[in-house]
A protein has these predicted regions:
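Acidic/His-enriched low-complexity segments
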Residues: 1-214
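Hydrophobic alpha-helical and helix-loop surface patches within well-folded domains
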Residues: 143, 176-331
Length: 331
């Protein structure tokens, strides 16, 4: 609850190994020191730290299933902490600053998260809530095992949020927010739910592939540094881009609809099908933009979309082309 307090954490890592001749190396870059021991298959072992890696000796590892337990302090570099809420943002390779992991997008795993938070806080993550448990002045939020995802798509949001629920949509979506204007909430939450449902319907029809994850919820955050982030099952948005004022222009409404369609499209392009490394991040972004345009543009016939595309993209493209060293798309 106090943003200055450290956050004690515990990792239980279950994995299968074929090679036990070499030590196991986990990515970890903490600003709170490093664990010097852990439990491997029930036996306490020393852990060595070298160049942002935890090195677990091969002696207690075995072929097949292994269980590794490490107690540590969660890193602060990707914990965006505010007075009444916090949220993780681990893209591109910052999961290692939060917890020990294999921090690369082509290694996917399932996650079972438990967050112990103040009683008046809500918690959102990429899988459904299994149960809540009272723990003194705090509440434990235990979530179901997630779908297989890359580390950069793991996330949680915790804080003093109001939660709106949509039973009209097929997926019973939830919206976490801190908006205090009751009129704005009443007028806009329905639009947000509808546009997410329309985006899911369109993507399912276009790809002939059902929504690939357990759920689709979202949180709006007034301190979010990006327009949105496509965390699996728990999208994050900058609050001001979704909760528009009554005086919002058609272009602002178009931008909101495209943002929602873009982040929803990432559930297929990026989250289900993922690039091997971030040198190809451009590909998932291009697909998401392409799908957002196809879905949303027809809903705003009064806007000249060709002119809008020209104004938004051509000046920046020409500026790069005129420079001495244009950057390659794949970096």
């Amino acid at each position: 609850e106090n943003r200055e307090d450290s956050i004690p954490s515990r990792l239980i890592l279950e994995l299968s190994l074929k090679d036990t001749e070499h030590p196991l190396v986990l990515d970890f870059k903490s600003d709170h020191g490093n664990p010097d021991s852990g439990i491997v298959n029930g036996v306490s072992v020393p852990i060595e730290y070298q160049k942002e890696h935890l090195i677990i000796p091969a002696g207690q590892l075995k072929e097949g299933k292994n269980k590794i337990e490490i107690e540590f302090t969660a890193g602060e570099m990707s914990l965006n902490r505010n007075e009444d809420h916090l949220f993780t943002l681990l893209v591109p390779d910052r999961a290692r600053t939060l917890f020990p992991c294999f921090d690369q997008p082509d290694i996917k795993a399932t996650y079972a998260l438990e967050v112990i938070a103040p009683d008046d806080w809500e918690v959102l993550c990429g899988s459904p809530l299994e149960k809540r448990e009272e723990k003194g002045q705090f509440t434990g939020h235990l979530f179901r095992e997630s779908d297989k995802i890359s580390t950069y798509l793991f996330s949680f949001v915790a804080g003093k949020f109001d939660v709106e629920k949509s039973y009209a949509t097929l997926r019973n979506m939830k919206l976490f927010h801190q908006v205090k204007d009751s009129t704005k909430i009443q007028l806009i939450t329905g639009v947000i739910f509808d546009q997410h449902q329309q985006s899911v319907d369109y993507m399912e029809q276009y790809t002939s592939y059902d929504f690939p994850f357990q759920k689709l919820d979202y949180a709006t955050l007034f301190t979010h540094p990006y327009g949105g982030m496509d965390h699996t099952g728990a999208i994050q948005y900058r609050q001001s881009l979704l909760f528009l004022d009554n005086s919002a222009t058609e272009n602002q409404k178009l931008r909101r609809a495209k943002l929602i369609a873009h982040e929803t499209a990432h559930m297929w392009f990026g989250n289900l099908v993922t690039m091997e490394w971030f040198s190809d991040v451009w590909m998932k972004e291009v697909f998401a933009n392409f799908m957002a345009d196809k879905l949303v543009n027809p809903e705003f016939p009064e806007i000249n979309h060709d002119l809008s595309f020209f104004v938004d993209h051509y000046p920046a493209a020409y500026t790069v082309d005129r420079s001495r060293g244009a950057n390659p798309i794949r970096q």
